[in-house]
């Protein structure tokens, strides 16, 4: 399947670095679905679905042992907030880039998330809500995303 999407402001790369605003090329597994329970009550998906809590964040602090992992928000650690007001993360699937044994500085918080206007991202892939809902119906726990 192909969907119109937006990518990182600085395009694609084969050599992702933290903060470069580039989307990594490759074939990657997808993580669990994180969703806003206050906005979506029932989702048609085979993915493991986890409600987003206000204290959820994704660590992008290269000095942290939790680099590129889901964390509880803390002022001590640099992070990307998962609970947002702008609706971009109402439905969010982490792209398993640099996640198994994260290499610090190689890039973090690469997600498949929502967009309303196809504005470029900081390295994520973003699609419209209707496309995400279609995608959620067809992807499985072992599905992969190909970024070329």
Language model: regions and residue ranges:
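Cell wall/extracellular polymer interaction/catalysis modules
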Residues: 1-122, 130-148
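A conserved hydrophobic position in a structured secondary element of the catalytic/binding core
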Residues: 127
């Amino acid at each position: 399947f192909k969907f119109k999407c937006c990518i990182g402001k600085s395009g694609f790369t084969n050599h992702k670095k933290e903060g470069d605003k580039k989307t990594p090329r490759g074939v990657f597994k997808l993580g669990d679905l994180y969703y806003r329970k206050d906005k979506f009550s029932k989702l048609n998906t085979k993915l493991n679905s986890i409600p987003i809590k206000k204290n959820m964040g994704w660590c992008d602090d290269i000095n942290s042992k939790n680099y590129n992992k889901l964390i509880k928000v803390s002022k001590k650690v640099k992070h990307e907030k998962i609970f947002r007001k702008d609706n971009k993360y109402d439905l969010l699937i982490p792209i398993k880039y640099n996640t198994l044994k994260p290499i610090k500085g190689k890039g973090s918080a690469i997600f498949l998330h929502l967009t309303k206007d196809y504005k470029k991202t900081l390295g994520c892939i973003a699609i419209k809500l209707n496309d995400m809902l279609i995608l959620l119906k067809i992807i499985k726990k072992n599905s992969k995303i190909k970024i070329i």
